[in-house]
Design a protein with these regions (language model features):
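Short, well-ordered coil/turn segments that N-cap beta-strands
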Residues: 2-5, 31-33, 110, 120-124
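Predominantly a Rossmann-like dinucleotide-binding segment in NAD(P)-dependent oxidoreductases
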Residues: 3-6, 11-105
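Beta-strand scaffold of nucleotide-dependent catalytic cores
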Residues: 32-35, 125-128, 151-153
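Active-site-lining helix/loop region of Rossmann-like oxidoreductase modules
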Residues: 78-85, 113-117, 122-128
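C-terminal glycine/acidic-rich active-site capping loop/insertion
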Residues: 88-91, 96-105, 113, 118, ...
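Short loop/turn motifs at secondary-structure junctions and domain boundaries
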Residues: 105-108, 132
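Short beta-strand-initiation
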Residues: 109-111, 137
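Glycine-rich phosphate/pyrophosphate-binding beta-alpha loops
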Residues: 127-136
């Protein structure tokens, strides 16, 4: 058709995010059966056009949640979702004591969670937040039949993992853990530049 499609999630162009996909595709983890992912902020509702359904559509889920979902779904080849059970709330954004200026306009989610069954028998446990009474929604875990991968609590929407990743597996029938160090990026380009060059 002469058309070119580029999936423009900038974190996909980070060397450490790419390592997640390489680990999964290498077979290091074996068949993946469970993923836990998400993220969020203790306080971080952006305001402006982000908090109104007419201009944003949805809140934290679309603003930052899409990056966590893409990080893991891209790594496992985007299997089709079969069923979704989801929940959302707006306890913080609508609270005038916390957000006196914006609470009256706030009509999107500031927290969302979902339990998603994917093709291939994979379970995806997802949660995302703009505001919560917690410092993190937890690390990302990818569990396979041969090994598991822990990705430290990440702000993947900024294009980074939260620290060295760890792989858990058995060696000679003993449980071991080893670290995947943070990789340096020698390209000399930012994520946006890499995205443009890949198009």
């Amino acid at each position: 058709t002469g058309k070119v499609l580029s999936i423009g999630f900038q974190p996909r162009f980070d060397v450490n995010m790419q390592m997640i996909k390489k680990i999964v595709e290498s077979g290091e983890l074996g068949e993946v059966y469970y993923i836990q992912t998400g993220g969020g902020r203790r306080r971080g509702i952006p305001g402006g056009t982000f908090i109104e359904q007419d201009t944003a559509g949805i809140g934290a889920l679309a603003d930052i949640g899409c990056y966590s979902l893409d990080m893991v779904l891209n790594a496992i080849g985007y299997p089709k979702p079969l069923t979704v059970s989801a929940y959302k709330s707006d306890f913080f954004g609508k609270n005038p004591e916390m957000y006196p200026e914006d609470s009256k306009r706030f009509n999107v989610d500031d927290f969302a969670a979902a339990f998603i069954r994917l093709e291939g028998g994979i379970i995806l446990d997802f949660r995302i937040s703009w505001a919560m009474h917690m410092d993190t929604a937890g690390d990302t875990l990818i569990l396979g039949k041969k090994a598991g991968l822990r990705i430290p609590s990440t702000e993947c929407w900024n294009g980074t993992v939260g620290g060295p990743m760890k792989i858990y597996r058995d060696v000679a029938n003993e449980p071991v853990c080893y670290e995947v160090p943070i990789l340096p990026d020698y390209s000399g380009m930012g994520l946006f530049d890499k995205k443009i060059h890949s198009f």
